[in-house]
């Protein structure tokens, strides 16, 4: 279901929600990936229970990848750079 701000809802051992966003690239662990405005807003609202599963070196033929998890102080571990802008024509 798109638009929720995360991909997978899980729970920790105490039953608290854990919101998981999965980001996959064929490139290295440092290859850029994209987060939507909605995903960033959800991350900021759920800092203690949000994590990003970063899959990289993805091989389609074997459906395999390397992985690490960003889950504590995510904003301090990533750089966000705007890459697109919404454009609206002004009324004249």
Write out the residue ranges for each language-model feature:
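Core nucleotidyl-transferase/polymerase catalytic module
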Residues: 1-3
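Acidic, glycine-rich loop-and-strand cores that form catalytic or ligand-binding grooves
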Residues: 13
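Short, surface-exposed beta-edge/turn micro-motifs
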Residues: 5-6, 16-17, 48-50
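Non-catalytic C-terminal interaction segments of nucleic acid-processing enzymes
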Residues: 46, 75-92
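Catalytic cores of nucleic-acid endonucleases
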Residues: 22-73
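Conserved catalytic cores of phosphodiester-cleaving nucleases, focusing on short active-site segments
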Residues: 7-10, 18-24
């Amino acid at each position: 279901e798109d638009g929720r701000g995360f991909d997978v809802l899980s729970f920790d051992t105490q039953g608290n929600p854990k919101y998981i966003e999965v980001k996959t690239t064929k490139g290295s662990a440092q290859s850029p990936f994209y987060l939507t405005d909605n995903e960033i807003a959800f991350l900021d609202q759920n800092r203690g229970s949000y994590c990003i599963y970063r899959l990289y070196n993805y091989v389609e033929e074997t459906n395999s990848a390397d992985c690490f998890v960003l889950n504590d102080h995510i904003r301090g571990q990533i750089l966000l750079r705007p890459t697109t802008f919404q454009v609206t024509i002004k009324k004249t």
